[in-house]
Design a protein with these regions (language model features):
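Juxtamembrane interface elements at the cytosolic ends of transmembrane helices
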Residues: 19, 124-128, 247-279, 307-321, ...
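Membrane-interfacial loop-to-helix junctions in multi-pass transporters
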Residues: 86-88, 98-106, 133-144, 178-180, ...
């Protein structure tokens, strides 16, 4: 009987596993890097030096895009562009401001947070959180966060700007580590970027690029033709992927990420964080009435939005488009940030009038001002991140790397289903440097779509495989446009948090998603023989 306690003691003394030690090393090495602002500034300067060397060494590759495509040079070459010359210096000096003001996430965050600020000032956001915390089953909270985050990537700005910060607040309110909530939501919004139960704006975009790439070897693939790749080409596979991502994201959060994060230490957080006990207070009668009226307001607004979007002559429909509903509604989908702004402000004013927290226009303006005043560190980070991303794009270094990687893969001369594994892994690698899904696919599709079609696979299946690689490394690359925002939110809960901690936190999701998604792809397409979308063939026959 004495042996059992000794065995338990030996197990208790056992150190962290190999994977945990690996994450600790990643975190340690990552945190040796300087402050994120300094890091982006140094990287921007490094790009200048590398671009000068690249042009001096005459780095160039053949442009895989067909002739006549916008952005393709007349001689069909992609050359490294140096910024270490008079022309480069003038370009930097003239565009320093526009790089910052034109950085995609900046305007999105500023406009959306004006509405969120009013919701915070009125108390609506806090009341909603308390209702969620008090009413939702605790054991389903993580799954709900991941699933909602995956679905939100139909309108990606909403997921990044609203859901990710919200998940951190909710987790803290129920006594869990806020960074675990942030990580779960980030993994859903960005790591599960291609999965969804709805057709999103990225679907027709990628389908158009795939159609043009398939046309290189088969002219029957053309816009408006019978073989045009539809926006629904991957819908069935991505619908099923949503639930796989939810399960994996939930398990990784509860089994790996939360235990590694340990206990939340409020002393390391920002001084202006809300009191976590507020999330556990019972709603007052005025707050309940305010929530009901705010909810009714949202329903009325949704009804009005439907009247503007669904009829054929609706104001939110594109009169020049007569295709899928998702294409007709593109003006509305591109107005998501504006809708977030309005859908936060109007119900917040209604709630504030009922509870007495919003008495006049000054209270509304005060809420907006408070939201803006909290963005100082983020604005500084974005300034330097925007310069780095712009410099990198100007030099063509990312595009050259993508083409070189694609050429390397073609030399393996693989056939059969196994060819998709190195293809997906290559897409994962390229995504670390080209954060835009459309930009990456525009460069690599003209290489891989014709190549894989010649060995017998349809463009629809090739596109589905690409989307796996494009999604799974979004959460571990600083080139992802919203990475700076996520880092700024995370630093509110740990002032000393560095890039290493954030990347180490997200690596388990990235690896797990990749393994799970590749497995699902092979089982769905090759073991079960199911189509990736309605009417999408698996194989291509010339």
């Amino acid at each position: 009987m004495a042996e059992a306690p000794r065995r338990r003691n030996r197990r208790a003394r056992k150190g962290p596993g190999l994977f945990t030690r690996f994450l600790n090393v990643v975190e340690f090495l990552g945190n040796l890097l300087p402050h994120p602002v300094t890091l982006f500034a140094v990287l921007a300067l490094l790009i200048l030096l590398v671009s000068g060397m690249a042009e001096m060494l005459d780095w160039q590759v053949d442009d895989p895009r067909p002739a006549g495509v916008s952005g393709r040079s007349e001689d069909g070459l992609i050359r490294a562009v140096s910024l270490m010359n008079p022309e480069g210096m003038r370009r930097i000096a003239m565009n320093l401001v526009t790089n910052f003001t034109g950085f995609a996430p900046l305007g999105t965050v500023l406009v959306a947070l004006l509405g969120v600020g009013v919701a915070e000032r009125s108390g609506l956001l806090g009341a909603l959180l308390r209702a969620l915390v008090l009413g939702a089953p605790r054991n389903l909270l993580t799954a709900v966060v991941v699933f909602a985050s995956v679905v939100s990537n139909t309108a990606s700005e909403m997921g990044y700007v609203v859901l990710i910060p919200l998940a951190a607040v909710v987790f803290r309110a129920v006594g869990r580590h806020p960074l675990a909530g942030l990580a779960a939501a980030f993994a859903g919004v960005s790591g599960g970027y291609s999965a969804n139960v709805l057709i999103g704006t990225v679907d027709p975009l990628l389908a158009g690029i795939t159609t043009e790439a398939a046309r290189i070897i088969d002219p029957s693939y053309a816009p408006g033709a019978v073989n045009e790749i539809p926006a629904t080409a991957n819908y069935l596979f991505m619908f099923v992927s949503t639930f796989m991502i939810t399960v994996i994201g939930t398990l990784v959060t509860t089994r790996i990420v939360e235990p590694k994060l340990g206990k939340f230490e409020p002393s390391r957080a920002a001084d202006d964080l809300e009191d976590p006990e507020e999330g556990l207070k019972t709603l007052s009668p005025e707050e309940k009435r305010g929530l009901k009226l705010a909810g009714l307001t949202v329903l009325v607004m949704l009804g009005g939005l439907a009247l503007l979007a669904l009829p054929e002559n609706g104001w939110f429909r594109d009169p020049a488009v007569n295709a899928l509903l998702i294409d007709d509604l593109r003006p509305m989908l591109r107005s998501v940030v504006s809708l977030i702004f309005v859908f936060f402000i109007v119900p917040s004013i209604v709630y504030g009038r009922v509870t007495g927290s919003v008495r006049n226009d000054r209270d509304v303006i005060d809420g907006m001002g408070r939201a803006m005043s909290s963005l100082g560190p983020y604005m500084v980070l974005v300034f330097f991140a925007a310069q780095f991303v712009s410099f990198f794009n100007w030099t063509n270094l990312g595009t050259i790397t993508a083409v070189v990687g694609a050429d390397l893969l073609t030399r393996f001369d693989l056939t059969g289903p196994v060819v998709f594994l190195p293809f997906i892994l290559m897409c994962c690698f390229v995504n670390l440097m080209l954060g835009s899904a459309s930009a990456q696919w525009a460069v690599t599709a003209p290489i891989f779509v014709p190549m894989l079609m010649t060995v017998g696979y349809s463009p629809e299946v090739i596109q589905a495989a690409y989307r796996i690689g494009d999604s799974t490394t979004n959460i571990i690359t600083p080139m992802m446009s919203y990475f700076g925002l996520i880092l700024a939110v995370a630093m509110r809960y740990d002032r000393k948090l560095g890039i290493g901690t954030l990347i180490a936190t997200m690596i388990p999701y990235s690896i797990s998603y990749l393994i799970g998604w590749v497995t699902l792809f092979y089982v769905w397409v090759f073991a079960l023989g199911l189509p990736v979308g309605p009417g999408s063939p698996t194989y291509y026959t010339p």
